[in-house]
Amino acid sequence: MEAQKLSAQEIIQFIGNAEKKTRVKVTLSGMPSFKAAGFLAENGRPNFKALANKGIQVLGDFHTHYSLKIIIGDWQAVRPLLSGLTENKDYTLELEGRNSAVPLLDTREINARIEPGAIIRDQVTIGDSAVIMMGAIINIGAEIGEGTMIDMGAILGGRATVGKNSHIGAGAVLAGVIEPASAEPVRVGDNVLVGANAVVIEGVQVGSGSVVAAGAIVTQDVPENVVVAGVPARIIKEIDEKTQQKTALEDALRNL
């Protein structure tokens, strides 16, 4: 799925100008303070239209006092509804961040496999048949090519780019660059394998067909079709048939 590609400066402006939100989910037994919060209609019932206009979502039976109810919205809008109620007695509250500027990506229409627990921020591009494993963290502006797997706990920083049919191993880090705006992001080519817990430093480009060994720290550009390893990473050999066999991807893992 193609997201709008943003430059570093555009991302900075997007975050800086975004309305900061502290989203909460309240589960309560009892009746919210609709009157005190100014959400009571003339007929004495909750004004659901006014609630919606404030970005507050309400679920449950609000005509029965002791039925279970759920309120979702920004803390500043929801807070007045809880006046007179006691936390952990009348209600419980779940907090999602504080003054967050970037929402999570809506993945409903993305033609990829995204496992529970992956954290993907808005303005991320994910190609068809890509795989995002649990615990992966993908920051704003990142791009993931078709058929690429981002393994468990891997981190793609802001604007990091990975080509097609690549594999970013568990715990690996592709360092992100949003500030300074002049810096270049990490770019990983097609058919690349980055081993577990490897780190690719800001601005580094990894050429197509190459392998970054587990635990390597890559501080310089990597040409195509080589294996790099060590701290800092150095070229240890060119890709040969044996290496290709060891690093081959499994198409079945990308079936949807």
Swiss-Prot record:
Pathway: Amino-acid biosynthesis; L-lysine biosynthesis via DAP pathway; LL-2,6-diaminopimelate from (S)-tetrahydrodipicolinate (acetylase route): step 1/3. GO terms for molecular function: tetrahydrodipicolinate N-acetyltransferase activity. It holds the Pfam family Hexapep. Its EC number is 2.3.1.89. GO terms for biological process: diaminopimelate biosynthetic process; lysine biosynthetic process via diaminopimelate. It comes from the Bacteria. It catalyses: (S)-2,3,4,5-tetrahydrodipicolinate + acetyl-CoA + H2O = L-2-acetamido-6-oxoheptanedioate + CoA. Keywords: Acyltransferase, Amino-acid biosynthesis, Diaminopimelate biosynthesis, Lysine biosynthesis, Repeat, Transferase. Gene3D superfamilies: Hexapeptide repeat proteins (2.160.10.10), Malonyl-CoA ACP transacylase, ACP-binding (3.30.70.250). The keyword Acyltransferase applies. PROSITE patterns: HEXAPEP_TRANSFERASES (PS00101). Catalyzes the transfer of an acetyl group from acetyl-CoA to tetrahydrodipicolinate. Belongs to the transferase hexapeptide repeat family. DapH subfamily. This is 2,3,4,5-tetrahydropyridine-2,6-dicarboxylate N-acetyltransferase. The lineage of its organism: Bacteria, Bacillati, Bacillota, Bacilli, Lactobacillales. The gene is dapH.
